[in-house]
Amino acid sequence: MAQALNSTNIAFFRVAFLFTIAFFCLKNVNSILQNTYFIVLTQAMNLPQLTLSRYSGQLGLFALLFTLNGVHDLIPLLENNVKYFQSVVPVRLLIFFILTSISYLWESNFYVHNNSVFIYCFAEVWINFLLYNAIREEKNEEFKRLNQFMVNDEDIEEPQPFTVKTETTEIIEIINDEENDDEDGKDNDDNNEKGNDDSDAKK
């Protein structure tokens, strides 16, 4: 399920969603406006229902806008332009969230306060939210892979400061012992020389 909801599949789903709306705007827009689920959601949200004639000249303009909006995502998607989606998806999500709120709350303006504007903006919020989460997860995984955060416990080497300190102490003790031996040898030689001088003086 997680592999199916990657950023590429969600982006293709949005492109197909926009092309489908554009097709029905030219074919028969009432296939969408009179859909059962569409009407149920309209009544549940207590929104005015938009009615359009299937021969309205405005539908050609709507179809063109939806088609261009889909192509606007399709070209970067085919080029695998990840930076484009990382930049545009958060902004687009914010814009559609604001439009959804305005469409529901601004009851005096029937240009935006109707079921078609609200449901379309709500669908865009849902799709872009899924796309934003997928892009963020893929970005985090790529960051972890590049910085090698996943390190095995066997690869970690524990430092050994105490062993080094012990060896240094032993070396110092050996040097001190050698110095003491040299001093004792010098004292014995001095004593022997003094003894020889005393014996010569007595003779």
UniProtKB/Swiss-Prot annotation:
TM helices/strands, residue ranges? 4-24, 59-79, 93-113, 115-135
Family recorded in the similarity comment: Belongs to the ILM1 family.
Q: How does it sit in the membrane?
A: Multi-pass membrane protein
Any other noteworthy remark? Present with 1160 molecules/cell in log phase SD medium.
Any ranges marked Cytoplasmic in the topology annotation, and which? 1-3, 80-92, 136-203
The segments labelled Disordered in the record are: 175-203
- Read off the InterPro entries from this record: Incr_loss_mito_DNA_1 (IPR018815)
Query: Compositional bias (Acidic residues) at which positions?
Result: 175-187
Tell whether Nucleotidyltransferase is among the UniProt keywords: no
Q: Where is the composition biased (Basic and acidic residues)?
A: 188-203
What is the name attached to this protein's record? Protein ILM1
The subcellular location is: Endoplasmic reticulum membrane
Question: Which regions face the Lumenal side of the membrane?
Answer: 25-58, 114
What cellular-component terms does GO give this entry?
Answer: endoplasmic reticulum; endoplasmic reticulum membrane
Instruction: Keyword check for Transmembrane, yes or no.
Output: yes
Write out the entry's keywords from A to Z: Endoplasmic reticulum, Membrane, Transmembrane, Transmembrane helix
Q: Name the gene behind this protein.
A: ILM1
